[in-house]
Amino acid sequence: MPEGPEIRRAADKLEAAIKGEPLTNVWFAFPQLQPYQTQLTGQRVTHIATRGKALLTHFSGGLTLYSHNQLYGVWRVVDAGVEPQSNRVLRVRLQTASKAILLYSASDIDILTAEQVANHPFLLRVGPDVLDMTLTAEQVKARLLSAKFRNRQFSGLLLDQAFLAGLGNYLRVEILWQVGLSGKRKAAELSDSQLDALAHALLDIPRLSYRTRGLVDDNKHHGALFRFKVFHRDGERCERCGGIIEKTTLSSRPFYWCPGCQH
């Protein structure tokens, strides 16, 4: 499953294709959205924001297209007027004079006003996004120590989008390896220096993954700058302590860690 860095890179590609250009054709499959087709034609996409796995496509007239890919949704960039052959069902088409972005198969799609965005049930549930560059380590540390999260085991907390949006399994295990913590630890147990290190890693590792354009299934995920230290490396030696990396299951997901140096 894609995590925050992959979702943000997908949004970047969509932005690069149509941002700032007048929309010449807007099409929605769902009847309740079709009244917006004429209204949005001629407007521009100002930017595309991400909140976890949700994309918010903002239009110059003030409306926002909310879409969540869930399990099957996928965006494509094509030349204007092109209709690719696909077994998927087309849900959204936003086209400019030169390019079009197409959303297939997703079912969680809506057009929202600014007030509706602020009160959307999913967006109210998710925490701040780790790729929001205004989010600071100090704010993350405060969330770690909050009554809501301080007594949660990290194995589950780091998968909970209500804590921080954009984290997933590979980020979970890499972050915990980086700071030498096991998945069963809790923020309430940590020293101040451990909390500082964790708060920084929760932002630094996702942002490095995003910047370096890595691939999830490639061991050299972060190119020359960063390699997976534990993810999909069970049975190999830990580069920090020489122990053997193990694979177990925590919070119903595969969990990779080094018992020798993660405590």
From Swiss-Prot:
Residues that, per the record, bind DNA: 70, 125, 169
Keywords: DNA damage, DNA repair, DNA-binding, Glycosidase, Hydrolase, Lyase, Metal-binding, Multifunctional enzyme, Zinc, Zinc-finger
Catalytic center residues: 2-3, 53, 253
Pfam families: Fapy_DNA_glyco, H2TH, zf-FPG_IleRS
Protein's UniProt keywords contain DNA-binding: yes
EC number(s) reported in the record: 3.2.2.-, 4.2.99.18
Single GO biological process annotation from the record: base-excision repair
Reactions catalysed, as given in the entry: 2'-deoxyribonucleotide-(2'-deoxyribose 5'-phosphate)-2'-deoxyribonucleotide-DNA = a 3'-end 2'-deoxyribonucleotide-(2,3-dehydro-2,3-deoxyribose 5'-phosphate)-DNA + a 5'-end 5'-phospho-2'-deoxyribonucleoside-DNA + H(+)
GO molecular function: class I DNA-(apurinic or apyrimidinic site) endonuclease activity; damaged DNA binding; oxidized pyrimidine nucleobase lesion DNA N-glycosylase activity; zinc ion binding
Cofactor(s) required, per the database record: Zn(2+)
SMART domains linked: Fapy_DNA_glyco, H2TH
Signal peptide region: none
FPG-type zinc finger segments: 229-263
Domain of life: Bacteria
Record-linked InterPro entries: DNA_glyclase/AP_lyase_DNA-bd, DNA_glyclase_Znf_dom_DNA_BS, EcNei-like_N, Endonuclease-VIII, FPG_cat, MutM-like_N-ter, Ribosomal_uS13-like_H2TH, Znf_DNA_glyclase/AP_lyase
Cofactor note: Binds 1 zinc ion per subunit.
PROSITE patterns assigned to the protein according to its UniProt record, in alphabetical order: FPG_CAT, ZF_FPG_1, ZF_FPG_2
Family annotation (SUPFAM superfamilies): Glucocorticoid receptor-like (DNA-binding domain), N-terminal domain of MutM-like DNA repair proteins, S13-like H2TH domain
Similarity comment: Belongs to the FPG family.
Reported function: Involved in base excision repair of DNA damaged by oxidation or by mutagenic agents. Acts as a DNA glycosylase that recognizes and removes damaged bases. Has a preference for oxidized pyrimidines, such as thymine glycol, 5,6-dihydrouracil and 5,6-dihydrothymine. Has AP (apurinic/apyrimidinic) lyase activity and introduces nicks in the DNA strand. Cleaves the DNA backbone by beta-delta elimination to generate a single-strand break at the site of the removed base with both 3'- and 5'-phosphates.
Protein name listed in UniProt: Endonuclease 8
Taxonomic lineage of the native organism: Bacteria, Pseudomonadati, Pseudomonadota, Gammaproteobacteria, Enterobacterales
Protein's gene: nei
